From Swiss-Prot:
Gene Ontology terms for molecular function: rRNA binding; structural constituent of ribosome
Keywords: Ribonucleoprotein, Ribosomal protein, RNA-binding, rRNA-binding
Domain of life the protein comes from: Bacteria
Protein source organism: Chlorobium phaeobacteroides (strain BS1)
Family per record: Belongs to the universal ribosomal protein uS14 family.
Purpose of the protein: Binds 16S rRNA, required for the assembly of 30S particles and may also be responsible for determining the conformation of the 16S rRNA at the A site.
NCBIfam families per the UniProt record, alphabetical: PRK08881.1
BP GO terms, sorted: translation
Assembly and interaction partners: Part of the 30S ribosomal subunit. Contacts proteins S3 and S10.
Keyword Protease belongs to the record: no
Annotated Gene Ontology cellular component terms: cytoplasm; small ribosomal subunit
Protein name as catalogued: Small ribosomal subunit protein uS14
Length: 89
């Protein structure tokens, strides 16, 4: 489980990205890089980390499911992910 402060910081960054998305696109199209650099750093989408929705883990996350590899495996084996089954051949 990731620290709550790390998860909260990432949520704050997501909110800033959403807040400044339109302004950022407008400045990029205009080519006003000086004004773009004056926006908050955390409003850039590259600062947001994809995290597991259950544990907050930041590595090994499947974006399609929003789960880290451990939780994905656990839930898939329990049959809680519809349409997912273990491969065998």
């Amino acid at each position: 489980m990731a620290k709550k402060s790390v998860i909260a910081r990432n949520e704050k960054r997501k909110a800033l990205v959403e807040k400044y998305a339109a302004k950022r696109d407008q400045l990029k199209k205009a080519g006003d890089y000086e004004a773009l650099s004056k926006l908050p750093r955390d409003s850039a989408s590259c600062r947001v980390r994809t995290r597991c929705v259950l544990t907050g883990r930041g590595r090994g996350v499947y974006e399609k499911f929003g789960l880290c590899r451990q939780m994905f495996r656990k839930l898939a084996l329990e049959g809680k992910l519809p349409g997912i089954k273990k491969a065998s051949w």
